[in-house]
Amino acid sequence: MGILLIGMSHKTSPLAVRERFSLSCENRDHPLDRIRQMPSIREALYLATCNRVEVLVSAAEEAEQAVEEGLKALMAERGGISGQELERCLYTLSGAEAVRHLFRVASSLDSLVMGEPQILGQVKEAYREAVEHGVTGILLNRILHHAFQVAKRVRTETGIADNAVSVGYAAVELAKKIFGRLDGKVILLVGAGEMSELAARHLLKQGIKSIFVANRTHARALEMAEQFEGKAVVLEQVPEVLKSVDIVISSTGASNYVLTRDMVAAALRRRKNRFLFLIDIAVPRDIEPAAGDIDNVYLYNIDHLQELVDENRNHRLREAEKAEAIIEEEVGNHTAWLSTLDVVPTIVEFREKIEGIMKAELGKSASWRHSLSEIDQRHVESLMASIVNKILHEPTACLREQSRNRNGKAYAAALRKLFKLER
């Protein structure tokens, strides 16, 4: 049996193509229902996310070409695109390369945002669906569980998921460094920019107590306040609101400063000098830089956040090198296990034959064994079983070892001939 993987990802295909393979579309059968009917395919996994669509199957090695063509035809039909158009988007991997790719995917090394945790859950969900459809067996079960173990090892032994790699998450990271805990804090959004909205969403997930939204257009402020279950205010109210907020995210890009040093200083006096975290992601800047010189005020602009993001991204790239080494080691372990499958039937038959001889000889001794006590009879049986295990140990260990060196089939054939094993 061989392993074959066919797929496309954000690296090889546009979203307009990938979304055609979504599992969420109504009135569509699951691809596994079709794949399981294809000749020569024994096991299958179908993974469909926003950023990738992949089919992993185990099939007879001699039928690999036909299986590949069949899967591509099925994907073209499902996506409603020509085979030629689909071919430009696809990659095809087999054997150890397919296993390596799956390990990298599960470990988030192949993700759009390297280190993100969602992909592992998506792979587990795809595996659950494959199990429910009855299209998994010894090979895919082993590979998938191994992939989960590899992903866990990568996450615990490297810093691949450490630190923020988006401006929104960078804002959360900085806020945590300043305040420690964010639950109970209050946010003021000034302006309705996309980045400020994303930053606010990330902060709200940390248990933020409430949010104020100020905008030049009050209708837009009301709209955003409704999204965040907050309160809309006009820009003129910002100096007054400053006294009661902990975090300000500003993104108006106005020609003049929306928050001046004097406004911030006045607010600090009324706040009894509680910390104030100002995030200015506007271009041109919304907050007068001198405001950052005030005690207990922490001012960061878009360049500061981007520097942090770049530093964190470089850190993840360094950690990715460690992760790749782990994956190479685990691919080697999988290959070693896979090579033993060729000799397993011989080992099983060898054990059955030797145990059969033992049972036959014990049967011949039934007449005199009856004169023994029950305890002594058990001792005899235990002794015979121990002798069998010792006889079996060296040959089977040698056979497994040689299978890892790709000599397994030759040694298995020799063992079968020596002991006249049937199959």
UniProtKB/Swiss-Prot annotation:
It comes from the Bacteria. This is Glutamyl-tRNA reductase. The gene is hemA. The active site is at 50 (nucleophile). NADP(+) binds at residues 191-196. Homodimer. GO terms for molecular function: glutamyl-tRNA reductase activity; NADP binding. InterPro entries: 4pyrrol_synth_GluRdtase, 4pyrrol_synth_GluRdtase_dimer, 4pyrrol_synth_GluRdtase_N, GluRdtase_CS, GluRdtase_dimer_dom_sf, GluRdtase_N_sf, NAD(P)-bd_dom_sf, Shikm_DH/Glu-tRNA_Rdtase. During catalysis, the active site Cys acts as a nucleophile attacking the alpha-carbonyl group of tRNA-bound glutamate with the formation of a thioester intermediate between enzyme and glutamate, and the concomitant release of tRNA(Glu). The thioester intermediate is finally reduced by direct hydride transfer from NADPH, to form the product GSA. Its EC number is 1.2.1.70. GO terms for biological process: protoporphyrinogen IX biosynthetic process from glutamate. Possesses an unusual extended V-shaped dimeric structure with each monomer consisting of three distinct domains arranged along a curved 'spinal' alpha-helix. The N-terminal catalytic domain specifically recognizes the glutamate moiety of the substrate. The second domain is the NADPH-binding domain, and the third C-terminal domain is responsible for dimerization. Substrate binds at residues 49-52, 111, 116-118, 122. It catalyses: (S)-4-amino-5-oxopentanoate + tRNA(Glu) + NADP(+) = L-glutamyl-tRNA(Glu) + NADPH + H(+). Belongs to the glutamyl-tRNA reductase family. The record marks 101 as: Important for activity. Catalyzes the NADPH-dependent reduction of glutamyl-tRNA(Glu) to glutamate 1-semialdehyde (GSA). Keywords: NADP, Oxidoreductase, Porphyrin biosynthesis. It is an enzyme of class 1 (oxidoreductase). Coiled coil: none annotated. CDD domains: NAD_bind_Glutamyl_tRNA_reduct (cd05213). SUPFAM superfamilies: Glutamyl tRNA-reductase catalytic, N-terminal domain, Glutamyl tRNA-reductase dimerization domain, NAD(P)-binding Rossmann-fold domains. Signal peptide: none annotated. Pathway: Porphyrin-containing compound metabolism; protoporphyrin-IX biosynthesis; 5-aminolevulinate from L-glutamyl-tRNA(Glu): step 1/2.
